[in-house]
Regions:
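Hydrophobic alpha-helical segments and helix-packing faces
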Residues: 23, 29, 36, 45, ...
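Generic structural signal for hydrophobic core residues of well-folded globular domains
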Residues: 28, 60, 67-71, 92, ...
Length: 384
């Protein structure tokens, strides 16, 4: 309804965006519907679930660390303005929050940093693709956008919405809405925000900074939204988890078994008349089989484990995955049941990884510049 008030229908620029983001988010969390499978044991189908290395989440975290880390510096020619902006960023935990947001930008393709004033105190919101609706854009130059967020309160929950709409002659107008509901109701109640419901900024400086992944969204080349770094590597993620699950099954199914006649697995009577089992019935190493006229003797079975072959297969899948997401070949190393960053990797200025990092840095630099302009405009900081 709020979008209709502004003259827009929901997500008019990309109707499939929400569906894609939810799919990417499922893979980021780790286990999806694709991790469920069934095995028939001769009597019935048994439901099973693949184990997961959560490689999508780990790769997004490692990619984010290339950009928002302790080496990041913001330099402004006017040192007075620089100090004030740096103070605001530090008070809002910018480095940590931006790093967390960047992880989700890599996972979901899009993010936004939104500075605003709360009783004349500068605050910053960090929103991922699930909370962003782009309303008007020229490629990735966003003019109109809506942000929304749901937060829990002591009495229930609170829905906040703010839309940034550009008038080509007057500048930006920001429309704010707040809705609340308590734990006993299902519908939200609109709160009266007074003059804050419509803020005419009289400025053409947007009070938001957009973040994207550098790759074109090949699911919709006209979409203004970014693409998950692993959007084209989902089959590889599933392949990684299948091999990882096979490693666990190899150990589990390859355990030694001792097959004993069922009469040998029964009980003897001791001197006190108590029944005592010949073999511990809870010991899964023993398996009772029918006795064929006393001819069946104890038999033992054991299998050679294929740990080395499966480890090599997992490493090959990891190499394929890291090449697809921008970390380069052989970035991860699987050892002792864990995934480690390969410290032997050396990044050259002529490598694919380096070039992809520079493309992402260009997008981040532009967003930080826009953020600094927005903060300076909000705080009415004057200077070049």
């Amino acid at each position: 309804n709020f979008l209709k008030e502004l003259g827009y229908s929901e997500n008019v620029l990309d109707s499939e965006q929400e569906k894609r983001v939810n799919n990417w988010l499922d893979w980021y969390k780790g286990k999806t519907k694709a991790h469920i499978y069934y095995i028939y044991n001769g009597e019935k189908k048994n439901k099973c679930e693949l184990k997961s290395l959560n490689i999508a989440s780990q790769s997004c975290e490692d990619l984010s660390d290339f950009f928002f880390n302790e080496k990041l510096e913001i330099t402004i020619s006017n040192k007075t303005i620089q100090n004030k902006i740096n103070d605001c960023l530090e008070q809002n935990g910018f480095l940590d929050n931006a790093n967390s947001l960047m992880q989700l930008v890599k996972a979901l393709g899009t993010g936004a940093i939104i500075p605003y004033l709360d009783n004349n105190v500068l605050r910053i919101n960090y929103l991922n693709a699930t909370n962003i609706v782009i309303l008007r854009a020229n490629k990735r130059e966003v003019q109109d956008v809506l942000f929304w967020n749901v937060s829990k309160t002591l009495k229930g929950s609170e829905l906040t919405i703010n839309a940034h709409i550009l008038d080509e002659e007057k500048g930006y107008t920001i429309y704010n809405r707040k809705y609340t509901k308590n734990g006993t109701t299902e519908e939200y109640t609109k709160e009266d925000l007074g003059n804050l419901e419509k803020i005419e900024t009289n400025s053409f400086i947007p009070k938001f900074a957009m973040l994207y992944t550098p790759e074109i969204n090949n699911a919709d080349i006209n979409s203004p939204y970014g693409r998950s770094c692993y959007a084209n590597a989902i089959d590889t993620i599933l392949g990684i988890d299948k091999v990882y699950d096979s490693l666990d099954n190899e150990t589990w199914l390859g355990r030694k078994r001792i097959y004993v006649p069922t009469n040998a697995a029964k009980f003897n009577v001791n001197q006190n008349g108590d029944m005592t089992p010949i073999f511990d019935p809870s010991d899964v190493a023993f398996y009772g089989v029918p006795d064929k006229d006393g001819k069946e003797m104890l038999k033992e079975s054991s299998f050679d484990l294929r740990i080395e072959e499966l480890t090599s297969a997992l490493q090959a899948q990891l190499n394929l995955y890291t090449s697809k997401v921008g970390l380069g070949h052989n970035y991860y190393k699987f050892k002792d049941g864990e995934v480690y960053v390969n410290t032997d990797n050396v990044m050259s200025s002529n490598s694919d990884v380096y070039r992809k990092i520079k493309k992402q840095e260009n997008i981040i630099t532009k967003a930080i510049v826009q953020l600094c302009y927005a903060i300076a405009d909000l705080l009415k900081l004057k200077g070049k």
